[in-house]
Amino acid sequence: MGGGDGAAFKRPGDGARLQRVLGLGSRREPRSLPAGGPAPRRTAPPPPGHASAGPAAMSSHIAKSESKTSLLKAAAAAASGGSRAPRHGPARDPGLPSRRLPGSCPATPQSSGDPSSRRPLCRPAPREEGARGSQRVLPQAHCRPREALPAAASRPSPSSPLPPARGRDGEERGLSPALGLRGSLRARGRGDSVPAAASEADPFLHRLRPMLSSAFGQDRSLRPEEIEELREAFREFDKDKDGYINCRDLGNCMRTMGYMPTEMELIELSQQINMNLGGHVDFDDFVELMGPKLLAETADMIGVKELRDAFREFDTNGDGEISTSELREAMRKLLGHQVGHRDIEEIIRDVDLNGDGRVDFEEFVRMMSR
């Protein structure tokens, strides 16, 4: 037996075959990798008895006829041109009616290129019947076409300003009657056209200025209260109580009374006092110097008391109204000449607001405030 084994091993390759069988084969040296990278590994085909072998293992668990049928159905549905499902939101069942919120505009199909085929953006929704029959869907204002706006929308609103109502002589009602004449005088200063009623009142204004100057201006004499005011100021600066004040005290007295004379005015005043009055001023000279200044200051200051005094000068019989004859007589005294009857009637007509032919105190105040 030993000889048989030895004879068997004498065959070429028997020893290497035996080593492979026993697992003691020599190790192979690692082969060098090619430049293109590792070669793909070859997988040995499975043995004939393996479970994955055969055509049945290559297909899925679904039968081949069923998979082909489902694919054909999907391709036919895509080729039929059916509506795609929306990308956003759930799919809507075509059998259900679409719901619309009250007041919203329904969708309209796109119009063709013909302008005559265009329709309004929205039409009033019909009244719903059934369970919702009591509810009426009203269209919103923005859904109405522009041509359907009512004609009342073009009318002015009640809050829009209306032209002021004008009364007699072109005066605005509810305003002072003096404003109409003042506006006409401003228009004349700008060169605008002046109404005829305002131009007729101009002669009255020219006659009124001398009256105001005589009653309240510098042409009048000092009132007793004004003389008493000057006397108190003179006594305050008469230090030695001899009835005279010097030039320096006169300047201080003027500043105390509210007059601010310049240095040049004080020099001229002192020269006049030294030359004509011996360097001292008594009360009469003081009134002569300060009277015109006091009258010039109060010339434009007309109060209610002064207006009542002037009204009494016109109202000679004291009945509270100025008649045509009283106005003619007062103007004759103030102006120094007789005024014609026609001119007096024009003055009364311009001043008389209630049209009774006479002038009361209220109308007189409005006349004087022009």
UniProtKB/Swiss-Prot annotation:
- Keyword tags: Calcium, Cell membrane, Cytoplasm, Cytoskeleton, Golgi apparatus, Lipoprotein, Magnesium, Membrane, Metal-binding, Myristate, Phosphoprotein, Repeat, Sensory transduction, Synapse, Vision
Instruction: Tell me the InterPro entries matching this sequence.
Output: CaBP1/2/4/5 (IPR043582), EF-hand-dom_pair (IPR011992), EF_Hand_1_Ca_BS (IPR018247), EF_hand_dom (IPR002048)
| Originating gene | CABP1
Q: What is the lineage of its organism?
A: Eukaryota, Metazoa, Chordata, Craniata, Vertebrata
**What is known about the tissue distribution of this protein?**
Retina and brain. Somatodendritic compartment of neurons. Calbrain was found exclusively in brain where it is abundant in the hippocampus, habenular area in the epithalamus and in the cerebellum.
Question: Which residues carry the N-myristoyl glycine lipidation?
Answer: G2
Q: Which residues bind Ca(2+) 1?
A: D238, D240, D242, Y244, D249
| Principal subcellular localisation of the protein | cytoplasm
- A Gene Ontology CC term for this entry? postsynaptic density
Consult the record and explain the modifications the protein receives after translation: Phosphorylated. The phosphorylation regulates the activity.
Q: Per its record, how is this protein called by name?
A: Calcium-binding protein 1
- Residues in domain EF-hand? 225-260, 279-296, 302-337, 339-370
Annotated region (Disordered), positions in chain: 1-198
